[in-house]
């Protein structure tokens, strides 16, 4: 089951990032996280920025609304997405 927690100002979403992929895409679920493949390498925060940009673009939000709360140096991250509800996140990623 996906870790997706609704808060009063947005949602917390657990993601599993696979860097250096062929293209940016959602790859389904990995345990309780949304698996995201990204072309960016895991160097100097590039994959983190690509993750923020990909999630923001998928939800039609500015990247400033997406913040990595934990897991900055890990493939598994918890991301806070401001200004959306859990249902919009589920629809955007086909969950």
Curated annotation (Swiss-Prot):
Per the UniProt record, one Pfam family is DUF167
Question: So what family is this one in?
Answer: Belongs to the UPF0235 family.
Please report the organism this UniProt entry assigns to the protein: Pelotomaculum thermopropionicum (strain DSM 13744 / JCM 10971 / SI)
Q: Which Gene3D superfamilies match?
A: YggU-like
SUPFAM superfamilies named in the record:
YggU-like (SSF69786)
One cellular component (GO) term of this entry: cytoplasm
Highest taxon in the source lineage: Bacteria
Q: What is this protein called?
A: UPF0235 protein PTH_1821
